[in-house]
Amino acid sequence: TPPERPREGSNVFEFMNSSSSSERPTQHIAKKVAEDIISTKKKGGKIVLVGGPAIVHTGAADSVSELIRLGFIDGVLAGNALAVHDIEYATLGTSLGMNVHDASLAYHGHRNHMDTINAVFRAGSISNMVKMKKLNKGIMYECVKNNVPFVLAGSIRDDGPLPDVITDVALAQKEYKKVLKDASMVIMVSTMLHSIATGNMLPANVKVIVVDISQPTVTKLMDRGTWQALGIVSDVGAFLPMVASQIRKKK
């Protein structure tokens, strides 16, 4: 049975009662999310991350990598972009030619994106790249090294796409469902397309946390049936490191 919405205190004239707002104490929410993640894992629960490329652009890739390495993420669902930008950052230090550590533009950095795609093609796959020691850190690296399943679903705008990307949408959906089976918590970060798609595959008793800097994205997800989601309007580059820091303190 789906969790009931609380009925007490529901008043037309209540303040701060929207389901998603940027006007919330971010540090406190990050602490609560960290506690939820730890509690879910202690109970033997399964946590799946649905991620977009902004994780890398905003400098949060290291935090996600750490969560995978520590065993807090049991599956990663994404598109071509997250994998490409993550591998570009891991191998060249840039994301779409921007130096992630200081936001400056790298010399000839516009080539890095396609160079990364070509490097994966030369290796044959992401896992081969790890085996060949051409990829030594990052989100995709941690997935391969820690046997965390990942599914990359293709879309019409993809560059490449990488060999690991499933371009048949129906097949990608099936693979998403396999990873989502028995999930206790799903964390959706900075991807409207994959978040809404995943939300449509989940039963109402799965805890969903959606983090995006765009409030309409969070609202759209809830409006399309994933009403049990906790919506957090925040910059993932600040929020995910806060969550990782809290987990480090508590674990």
Feature locations, PLM:
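Short, compositionally biased "basic patch" segments
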Residues: 1-18, 25-32, 140-145
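Short acidic, glycine/serine/threonine-rich loops at helix termini
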Residues: 2-4, 59-63, 86-92, 162-165, ...
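Gly-rich Lys/Arg/Thr-decorated short loops/hinges at beta-loop-alpha junctions or inter-strand turns
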Residues: 6-22, 43, 117-123, 157-159
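Structured alpha-helical segments in the cores of large, soluble enzyme domains
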Residues: 25-40, 217-222, 239-240
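Glycine-rich phosphate/diphosphate-binding loops that line cofactor/substrate pockets in enzymes
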Residues: 31-47, 67, 142-145, 179-183
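Active-site histidine-anchored catalytic micro-motif
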Residues: 47, 65-68, 72-118, 188
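Gly/Ser/Thr-rich loops at beta-strand to alpha-helix junctions
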Residues: 52-58, 81-84, 158, 191-195
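C-terminal functional extensions of proteins
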Residues: 99-251
